[in-house]
């Protein structure tokens, strides 16, 4: 998404976490493993400069990406 480098799947992942869906359930919904969800989440956090999943969700919500 723009110069941030978040894909549509990244935004879906963050939106699901924002709803309170567990990492493993997000993985099942996206047809990937929970480990892959965690790896993607770490990449998202690194790209946007935050330390935690909660911060990543808040970052995306503040920018109305999710």
Model feature map: region roles:
Residues 40-43:
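Residues within the DNA-recognition helix of helix-turn-helix
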Residues 46-66:
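Basic, Lys/Arg-enriched C-terminal extension of HTH/homeodomain DNA-binding domains
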Residues 1-38, 63:
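Helix-turn-helix DNA-binding segment
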């Amino acid at each position: 998404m723009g110069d941030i480098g978040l894909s549509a799947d990244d935004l879906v992942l963050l939106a699901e976490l924002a709803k309170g869906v567990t990492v493993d359930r997000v993985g099942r919904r996206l047809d990937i493993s929970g480990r892959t969800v965690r790896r993607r989440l770490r990449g998202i956090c690194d790209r946007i400069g935050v330390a935690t999943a909660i911060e990543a969700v808040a970052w995306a919500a503040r920018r109305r990406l999710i």
